[in-house]
Amino acid sequence: MRKKNYKGRCEKRSVPKCEGICKTYDTLQSRLVDILSEDDAVKEIRCNVLMEDTDYTSDIVCIMNDDTLVVYECCYRHLIKRPTTARLLQQSREFWLGHGIKEEDWRLAVDAEK
């Protein structure tokens, strides 16, 4: 999750399953986009999707071949215990569950343990 007007460094690139330019803000988000673009079950990928009535965006929203939505939030392992991170992740989860996403279709992508 990021602020909707995040001013940090981003990588702009073209991804086959993403309309227009895909903007990724860190290596975790970029790698997840690569993995999802190779997945045959994914029909479309959307990056940095604005959550209405909030100042934040969800990292990745996928439309699967059966037209269900799957939401991915990217989080680094060392940040996951922070109260602010937990609050924002909970806010994202509640937002998407309120918009018809199933519990198992809201997912958290975490970097590998070192």
Map each language-model feature to its residues:
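Electrostatic, structured charged patches in enzyme active sites and in nucleic-acid/phosphate-binding
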Residues: M1-K114
